[in-house]
């Protein structure tokens, strides 16, 4: 923890091609070993495939997918008198976006298509239609929060 008070959050940079912050965040999530040009090629290719398959703006498709994947609740472990409880808490907006992007990338890497461009494009399209592994992950998290609703009074 810094002694000089809270650290200022860096401003989010808009993407040069689509002019959207979410696209640049997605590029940074795809990034491996600092190869940003490769990550950009993958994301732009996937968004272009989304445009070809749906005929709509790919950024709108991405936003719709993220809205379907963003969690509203999550569980956090809280130790109370020797027992650990899974306490449901609300997710901050920034964290929900980060989690949604992380899940999109993680589950697109696990898909069986040939190239990463195809995998990411299909995961985005599935998520925008309410399907796919990333949407299932959100549903599982919400189910867990609902199951542990009795411990909500331990919220901090």
Curated annotation (Swiss-Prot):
<comment type="similarity">
    <text>Belongs to the universal ribosomal protein uS7 family.</text>
</comment>
<dbReference type="InterPro" id="IPR020606">
    <property type="entry name" value="Ribosomal_uS7_CS"/>
</dbReference>
<dbReference type="GO" id="GO:0003735">
    <property type="term" value="F:structural constituent of ribosome"/>
</dbReference>
<comment type="function">
    <text>One of the primary rRNA binding proteins, it binds directly to 16S rRNA where it nucleates assembly of the head domain of the 30S subunit. Is located at the subunit interface close to the decoding center, probably blocks exit of the E-site tRNA.</text>
</comment>
<dbReference type="GO" id="GO:0015935">
    <property type="term" value="C:small ribosomal subunit"/>
</dbReference>
<keyword id="KW-0689">Ribosomal protein</keyword>
<comment type="subunit">
    <text>Part of the 30S ribosomal subunit. Contacts proteins S9 and S11.</text>
</comment>
<keyword id="KW-0820">tRNA-binding</keyword>
<dbReference type="InterPro" id="IPR000235">
    <property type="entry name" value="Ribosomal_uS7"/>
</dbReference>
<dbReference type="InterPro" id="IPR023798">
    <property type="entry name" value="Ribosomal_uS7_dom"/>
</dbReference>
<keyword id="KW-0687">Ribonucleoprotein</keyword>
<dbReference type="GO" id="GO:0000049">
    <property type="term" value="F:tRNA binding"/>
</dbReference>
<dbReference type="InterPro" id="IPR005717">
    <property type="entry name" value="Ribosomal_uS7_bac/org-type"/>
</dbReference>
<dbReference type="GO" id="GO:0019843">
    <property type="term" value="F:rRNA binding"/>
</dbReference>
<protein>
    <recommendedName>
        <fullName>Small ribosomal subunit protein uS7</fullName>
    </recommendedName>
</protein>
<dbReference type="GO" id="GO:0006412">
    <property type="term" value="P:translation"/>
</dbReference>
<keyword id="KW-0694">RNA-binding</keyword>
<keyword id="KW-0699">rRNA-binding</keyword>
<dbReference type="Pfam" id="PF00177">
    <property type="entry name" value="Ribosomal_S7"/>
</dbReference>
<dbReference type="InterPro" id="IPR036823">
    <property type="entry name" value="Ribosomal_uS7_dom_sf"/>
</dbReference>
């Amino acid at each position: 923890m810094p002694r000089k008070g809270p650290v200022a959050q860096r401003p989010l940079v808009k993407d040069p091609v689509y002019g959207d912050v979410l696209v640049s965040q997605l590029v940074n999530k795809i990034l491996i070993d600092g190869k940003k040009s490769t990550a950009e090629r993958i994301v732009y290719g996937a968004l272009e495939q989304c445009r070809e398959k749906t005929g709509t703006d790919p950024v709108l498709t991405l936003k719709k997918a993220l809205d379907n994947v963003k969690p509203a609740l999550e569980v956090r472990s809280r130790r109370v008198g020797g027992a650990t409880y899974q306490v449901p808490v609300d997710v901050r907006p920034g964290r929900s976006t980060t989690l949604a992007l992380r899940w999109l990338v993680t589950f697109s890497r696990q898909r069986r298509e040939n190239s990463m461009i195809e995998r990411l494009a299909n995961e985005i399209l599935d998520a925008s239609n309410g399907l796919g592994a990333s949407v299932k992950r959100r549903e599982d998290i919400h189910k867990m929060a609902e199951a542990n609703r009795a411990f909500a009074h331990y919220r901090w």
